[in-house]
């Protein structure tokens, strides 16, 4: 087990003027599961590959424990990777696939067999040890890939979107399985995903990246409750946060004639700016007779919850507003709702910098 550190780590691909990863400073604590999350091109997989030794580090350094591994060959770093593709050998059975890295490391046969037996039992794979990958389901193949990493007993697990090939139901199950396994083993883990639901449900902390730069690093709850900037606010949360520019005067916003009093802690700074980006989670909009008029375009009913996707005449023109509604009595398409933000659920951002006030 080991602490992992990126210290100003930068990667610029040949022929590009932009850094794929730009001066990343990040410490992953021993035994922690940290999730790197962001859209395509954010630098999350580049960071993982640099940690594994599969990408060059153009400047800065990378550490595993007390060892600077910046220029160390991948095979000497003692990390195990799990990929989106299971990368199993089709002609080997499950036991041989799991034992393969131990065989390459010249681990004695008796020890190989004992490690495979122990890990197979842990991952509920014992009855499949004699089967070939083609005889397994997607979830079982992913567990075999996990088992092959676990038997190595590495300093860290590096997981690159390992659940992307699974259907929705299996992803939910495997999210819980991976999180439980990591807690049980206590192995430092870096997990890469574009799926913010995976990030929120699995990580002890999450690192949100965009265009190669770290936007925010904190617990899932803290990132959701206090997004550092407009990008994080719009990326983390499903459905996404509503973001609306509004003018401010005397400590209040004006939304199409509806006056919204700002929290006292933010009112002076917002008034000084004169204009802010107002962030509203869908569950922070409540029905009110004096609220903003919003026409229902679509209702997304997911059973326990329902969301109305509405059009509203807001500053800057007609905008989309998403509001959580009563799933037992959802509104009809074309119906007009009156919605008012909950004052203590407002998020305020500087429109020039995008940073949180």
Each predicted region: which residue ranges?
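The feature captures the beta-strand-to-loop junction immediately N-terminal to the Walker
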Residues: 37-39
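Helix-to-loop junction immediately C-terminal to a conserved catalytic motif
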Residues: 52
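A short, flexible loop at the N-terminus of ABC-type nucleotide-binding domains that lies
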Residues: 2-3, 11-23, 72-76
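Conserved ABC transporter NBD signature motif
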Residues: 60-68
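Conserved coupling/switch loops of ABC nucleotide-binding domains, chiefly the family-specific signature
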Residues: 58-61, 111, 211, 346
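Non-catalytic connector elements of ABC transporters
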Residues: 239-241, 251-357
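ABC ATPase nucleotide-binding domains
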Residues: 74-231
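Pre-Walker A (P-loop) beta-loop-beta motif of ABC nucleotide-binding domains
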Residues: 24-35
């Amino acid at each position: 087990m080991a602490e992992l550190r990126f210290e100003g780590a930068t990667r610029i691909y040949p022929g590009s003027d932009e850094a794929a990863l730009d001066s990343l400073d990040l410490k992953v604590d021993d035994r922690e599961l940290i999730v790197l999350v962001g859209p395509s091109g954010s630098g999350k997989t580049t960071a993982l590959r640099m940690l594994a030794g599969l990408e060059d580090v153009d400047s800065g350094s990378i550490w595993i424990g007390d060892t600077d591994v910046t220029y160390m060959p991948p095979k000497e770093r003692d990390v195990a990777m799990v990929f989106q593709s299971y990368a199993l050998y089709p002609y080997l059975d499950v036991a041989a696939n799991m034992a393969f890295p131990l065989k390459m490391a010249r681990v004695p046969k008796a020890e190989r067999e004992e490690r495979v037996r122990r890990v197979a039992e842990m991952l509920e794979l014992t009855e499949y040890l004699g089967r070939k990958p083609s005889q397994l389901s997607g979830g079982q193949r992913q567990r075999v890939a996990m088992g092959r990493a676990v038997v190595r007993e590495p300093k860290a697990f590096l997981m690159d979107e390992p659940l992307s090939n699974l259907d929705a139901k299996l992803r939910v199950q495997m999210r819980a399985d991976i999180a439980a396994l990591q807690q049980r083993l206590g192995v430092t883990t870096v997990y890469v995903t574009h799926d913010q639901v995976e990030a929120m449900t699995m990580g002890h902390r999450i690192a949100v990246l965009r265009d190669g730069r770290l936007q925010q690093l904190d617990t899932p709850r803290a990132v959701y409750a206090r997004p550092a900037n407009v990008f994080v606010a719009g990326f983390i949360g499903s459905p996404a946060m509503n973001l609306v520019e509004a003018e401010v005067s005397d400590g209040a916003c004006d939304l199409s004639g509806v006056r919204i009093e700002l929290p006292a802690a933010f009112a002076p700074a917002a008034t000084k700016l004169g204009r802010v980006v107002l962030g509203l989670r869908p569950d922070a909009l409540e029905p009110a007779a004096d609220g903003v008029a919003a026409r229902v375009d679509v209702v997304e009913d997911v059973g326990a919850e329902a969301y109305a996707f509405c059009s509203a005449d807001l500053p800057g023109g007609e905008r989309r507003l998403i509001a959580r509604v009563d799933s037992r009595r959802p509104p009809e398409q074309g119906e007009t709702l009156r919605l008012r933000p909950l004052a203590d659920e407002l998020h305020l951002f500087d429109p020039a910098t995008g940073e949180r006030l």
